[in-house]
């Protein structure tokens, strides 16, 4: 018997071009409409730093007797400072996946899967991880994770104290720019946002003479600053515990200089770019598609 996937699309802010979060009310509604769901998978924080109400969503999901799995790939740092939102691992999620390499001092491709409750079938997880993982693990990567955890155990408090101090100082400075706006969670309208990861630096170009792609290019070509991503209406930078005071200073100076050069424009004249993807109609499940008769076109 094939099991189908049911997708819940996030709230959207069309003005800023940013996707928001998933509300507990929408989760409740979807689970009531789809009684055969066996697990609920949610991304929080998102790439842009949007955090959903994990605690309430966990309560909703558990009322339906299924586990909550949280993709917290961009939130491995949350546990280390009260400056950031609370990790899903502490809010009732049953399984939490974190990528060390995204926001902690660890090599690329290092990640962990936390089993946080008895609702997770440990033996089944081990079996499938054994199927999908390589039979030739990298001891360099595993040593990198050990070194990361050892470093955080010894110096983590001081490292994150300095990091959050420099980050907040930079955010305060960047918030004073007149045209390029540093986005806060409260600025994203109708978003279903419960909290916001302030290590994500979102620079809105709405109402300016540049778009996100051009701002990204200027930062790279003129200032040699490589941002994380460019979208139509904003640029994303991800700050992490390894960032230095000098690095924040360079970014602030660059944004301030660009802000002074560009022009303010009428928002109504901007192209109506939509964040939402087309709502596709599901004709078959992934498993059905894999097993279906196929035809090759040259």
Which residues does each predicted region cover?
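Conserved PLP-enzyme active-site core in the AAT-like
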Residues: 3-187
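Non-catalytic terminal extensions of PLP-dependent enzymes
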Residues: 172-298
């Amino acid at each position: 018997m094939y099991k189908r996937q049911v997708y819940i699309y996030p709230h959207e802010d069309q003005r800023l071009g940013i996707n928001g979060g998933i509300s507990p009310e929408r989760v409740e509604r979807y689970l009531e409409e789809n009684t055969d769901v066996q697990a609920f998978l949610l991304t929080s924080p998102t790439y842009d730093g949007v955090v959903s109400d994990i605690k309430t969503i966990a309560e909703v999901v558990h009322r339906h007797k299924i586990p909550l799995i949280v993709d917290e790939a961009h939130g491995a740092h949350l546990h280390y400072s009260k400056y950031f939102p609370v990790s899903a691992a502490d809010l009732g999620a049953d399984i939490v996946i974190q990528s060390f390499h995204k926001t902690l001092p660890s090599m690329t491709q290092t990640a962990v899967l936390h089993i946080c409750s008895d609702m997770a079938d440990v033996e089944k997880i081990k079996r499938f991880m054994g199927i999908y993982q390589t039979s030739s693990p990298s001891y360099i990567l595993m040593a990198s994770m050990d070194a990361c955890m050892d470093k955080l155990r010894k110096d983590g408090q001081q490292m994150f104290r300095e990091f959050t101090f420099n980050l907040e100082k930079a955010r305060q400075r960047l918030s004073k720019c007149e045209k390029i706006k540093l986005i806060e969670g409260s600025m994203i309208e109708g978003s279903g946002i419960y909290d916001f990861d302030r290590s994500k630096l979102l620079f809105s170009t709405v109402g300016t003479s540049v778009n996100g792609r051009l701002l990204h290019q200027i930062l790279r070509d003129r200032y040699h600053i490589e941002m994380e991503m460019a979208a139509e209406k904003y640029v994303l930078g991800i700050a992490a515990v390894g960032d230095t005071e000098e690095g924040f200073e360079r970014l602030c100076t660059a944004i301030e200089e660009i802000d002074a050069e560009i022009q303010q424009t009428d928002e109504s004249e901007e192209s109506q770019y939509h964040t939402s993807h087309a709502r596709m109609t599901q004709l078959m499940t992934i498993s059905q598609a894999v097993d279906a008769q196929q035809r090759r076109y040259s």
